[in-house]
Amino acid sequence: MLSPKRVKFRKMFKGRMTGLAHRGSDVSFGTYGLQALEPGWVTSRQIEACRVAMTRHIKRGGKVWIRIFPDKPITKKPAETRMGKGKGSPELWVAVVKPGRVMFEIEGVSKELAETAMSLAAAKLGVKTKFVAREEAVTHEG
């Protein structure tokens, strides 16, 4: 599972997911990509499940890039604990995804195979996505 090696602070504010992704909205490494259509948190477990699903489906051919990294710690208080007494301990790591962000990319496989691999990955995510090719990836600037 992906997680940062070191962090400056153990706990982070919840934050707000407003606006569109200005960076990382183009397919830049591979030929095909999976682009987010809505904001959300993608956990390190979800990212790993997507990676495994895609690499198993494309077998030996092709290369997969993961364009997001879970760098935000999410805290959780123990079960049946009264409110107060401070913030809970870090439980999991998430990547904050905004609409337009390309999360995964594939190269070296046919369009049909890439599309089915991306749909397998999309089923593991908690955000709506769409399949994009390098030439038709939409940038949200302006």
Swiss-Prot record:
One of its GO terms (biological process) is translation. One of its GO terms (cellular component) is cytosolic large ribosomal subunit. CDD domains: Ribosomal_L16_L10e. One of its GO terms (molecular function) is tRNA binding. Binds 23S rRNA and is also seen to make contacts with the A and possibly P site tRNAs. Part of the 50S ribosomal subunit. NCBIfam families: rplP_bact (TIGR01164). This is Large ribosomal subunit protein uL16.
